[in-house]
A protein has these predicted regions:
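Small-residue hinge/turn detector
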Residues: 66-78
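Glycosyltransferase-associated regions of secretory-pathway enzymes
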Residues: 1-65, 81-172
Length: 172
């Protein structure tokens, strides 16, 4: 069962705009008994792997979050949402699963739209380990901007998923 925790990231130290506050307030409204945890430079190790450290130094915080969200859900369990995701109904029904993810469209999974899992599921370790083999800054100085939808989708293709946008149970 997925624990009642909502994780989000806010790197860079800037003030949260009203649109972000509106989304976070929707989480509080529809998930009032959930622990909402903000992760940032003070409680997340941005030096945990080269990809994360390089993305952070380049101020490409969305790419830091792509990896960090996997790490905290793997370690603590719970739900992750980007700060532009507004909740419009309670999420309690999703907690009965060991994990869930959402489709961005019929061809791509998008962890930023929200996903949840019990702590310690092997799939998320595999997903994290994929990033351990990469640098964010390529040898020619360009950025490795492979987003989380492609990484998650490519990995899930090896786990019995059908790219049709349907609700499905993925084999263990």
């Amino acid at each position: 069962m997925i624990p009642k925790k909502i994780h989000y990231f806010w790197f860079g130290g800037n003030e949260k705009p009203k649109s972000v506050q509106k989304c976070i307030n929707s989480w509080k409204k529809y998930c009032p008994d959930y622990e909402i945890i903000e992760w940032n430079e003070t409680n997340f190790d941005i030096h945990c792997m080269p990809f994360v450290e390089q993305a952070y130094e380049a101020k490409k915080y969305a790419f830091v979050s792509d990896v960090a969200r996997l790490m905290v859900v793997y370690e603590y369990g719970g739900i992750y949402m980007d700060t532009d995701v507004e909740v419009i109904k309670p999420l309690d029904d999703l907690l009965e699963n060991r994990a869930y993810m959402s489709f961005e469209n019929n061809e791509n999974i998008n962890t930023g739209q929200g996903f949840g899992a019990e702590a310690g599921l092997p799939f998320f370790k595999e997903h994290i380990d994929a990033y351990r083999n990469w640098n964010f800054i390529n040898d020619d100085g360009t950025y490795n901007q492979i987003g989380c939808p492609k990484v998650a989708t490519d990995l899930f293709k090896t786990k019995c998923i059908f790219l049709d946008g349907s609700e499905q149970t993925v084999c263990d």
